[in-house]
């Protein structure tokens, strides 16, 4: 067998249905659109969410909540990610960004307590969860809020 003889497995690829190409094709003349009406016209059809004049679902349901314009979004780092650093390292947001642990600084860095920290580190971040702070100090390191 040569490269030009390769063919996809039987039934793995369906041929495109070419509509409006003669009566014999089974999809000629009206091209599967039926006779006249809004959906038979070019650009025909209704917009998404339109229910024929009935009050649409999204308008029948109440509004909920709001978007806080002052919200802060933190880059999240779990404890198990900090094990990649050498013992005694001072872990800063800049170092985390440099090493690819986080992709963006956002509004700062928050350290969360998922996983187990096995090294003594000095961690500097904008926020710490209670469990993360406890785990860092239990490993002999320090958690410093910047």
Curated annotation (Swiss-Prot):
Comp. bias regions, Basic and acidic residues: 1-13
GO MF terms listed in the record are: rRNA binding; structural constituent of ribosome
Q: Which domain of life is it from?
A: Bacteria
Gene3D superfamilies assigned to the protein according to its UniProt record, in alphabetical order = 3.100.10.10
Q: Example GO biological process term?
A: translation
* Ranges for region Disordered: 1-54
Residue ranges annotated as compositionally biased, kind Gly residues, are 21-31, 42-52
Q: Which UniProt keywords apply?
A: Ribonucleoprotein, Ribosomal protein, RNA-binding, rRNA-binding
* A cellular-component GO term for this protein: cytosolic large ribosomal subunit
Keyword Transcription regulation in the entry? The reply is no
Transferase as UniProt keyword: no
Q: How does it assemble?
A: Part of the 50S ribosomal subunit.
Q: Which family does it belong to?
A: Belongs to the universal ribosomal protein uL15 family.
The function of this protein is: Binds to the 23S rRNA.
Question: What's the protein name?
Answer: Large ribosomal subunit protein uL15
Annotated organism of origin: Bacillus licheniformis (strain ATCC 14580 / DSM 13 / JCM 2505 / CCUG 7422 / NBRC 12200 / NCIMB 9375 / NCTC 10341 / NRRL NRS-1264 / Gibson 46)
């Amino acid at each position: 067998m040569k490269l030009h003889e390769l063919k996809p497995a039987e039934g793995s690829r369906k041929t495109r249905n070419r509509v409006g190409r003669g009566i014999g094709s089974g999809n000629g003349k009206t091209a599967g659109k039926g006779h006249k009406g809004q959906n038979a016209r070019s650009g025909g059809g209704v917009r998404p969410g339109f229910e024929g004049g009935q009050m649409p679902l999204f308008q029948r349901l109440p509004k909920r909540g709001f978007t806080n314009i002052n919200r802060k979004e933190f880059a999240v780092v779990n404890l198990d990610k900090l094990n990649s650093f050498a013992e005694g390292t001072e872990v800063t947001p800049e170092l985390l960004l440099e090493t690819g642990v986080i992709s963006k600084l956002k509004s700062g860095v928050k350290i969360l307590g998922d996983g187990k920290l096995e090294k003594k580190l000095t961690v500097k971040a904008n926020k710490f969860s209670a469990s993360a702070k406890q785990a860092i100090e239990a490993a002999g390191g320090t958690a410093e809020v910047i």
